[in-house]
A protein has these predicted regions:
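Append "and occasionally in soluble cytosolic enzymes with long acidic Gly/Pro-rich linkers
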Residues: 1-35, 117, 169
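Surface-exposed patches in mature extracellular/periplasmic domains of secreted proteins
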Residues: 4-7, 46-50, 110, 114, ...
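Loop/turn elements at helix/coil->beta-strand transitions in domains of secreted/extracellular proteins
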Residues: 13-15, 40-44, 57-59, 125-128
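Cofactor-binding loop segments of dinucleotide-utilizing enzymes, especially the Rossmann-like FAD-
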Residues: 21, 50, 65
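Detector for C-terminal structural segments
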Residues: 26-35, 54-170
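Long, His/Glu/Asp-enriched segments that create or flank divalent metal/ion-associated functional microenvironments
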Residues: 29-50
Length: 170
């Protein structure tokens, strides 16, 4: 540990930067909290908030996503080799096979089995360091009816507004 409180090796300080997209205050706050904790253990971690994310040039990034309506919605794009939202260039043949087979079936039991295979493969070879699940708190007047609290899964889940067209107000 150096005099500045950070580890070095061969004269080079152990350091990295977490990039976070601008306009995502919740993720900016999470990145800043993580950086503070990482600095406390001797790694010089900083946060940058670029106007435009350079997906090929960052050291680390804090992102989030969800598949609120169907597991295939974002999962295939995020974890499939060479897919559009696979920003980390993750590649795993078992993950690709499970995701491809799951999206080719309309049988819920078959899809569930393939998504279980996907989760096992991803757990054995993680694409990311998953650090949290962002949840949400909502408050509404008791005069509003139709909100189903069981579907509230944060801003990436189904969300509170999934059935807004059926809500009524006394």
């Amino acid at each position: 540990l150096g005099a500045d409180g950070f580890y070095t090796r061969g004269g080079e300080q152990l350091a990295f930067t977490i990039s976070v997209m601008s306009g995502e205050q919740d993720r900016i706050d999470i990145a800043q909290a993580a950086a503070q904790q990482i600095r406390a253990i001797g790694i010089n971690c900083t946060v940058e908030i670029p106007a435009q994310m350079d997906w090929s040039g960052q050291m680390a990034c804090l992102i989030g996503w969800g598949s609120p309506f169907d597991a295939d919605d974002h999962t295939y794009k995020v974890f499939g080799t060479d897919k559009g939202a696979n920003y980390s260039s993750y590649s795993n043949a078992a993950v690709d096979e499970a995701l491809t087979k799951a999206r080719q079936s309309d049988d819920p039991a078959v899809r569930k089995a393939y998504y279980a295979d996907f989760q096992q493969a991803l757990a054995a070879d993680p694409a990311y360091a998953f650090i949290c699940y962002i949840d949400a708190n909502y408050v509404a007047t008791s005069r509003l009816h139709g909100i189903d609290a069981e579907t509230v899964m944060g801003h990436h889940g189904v969300g509170i507004f999934w059935n807004v067209e059926t809500w009524t107000l006394d």
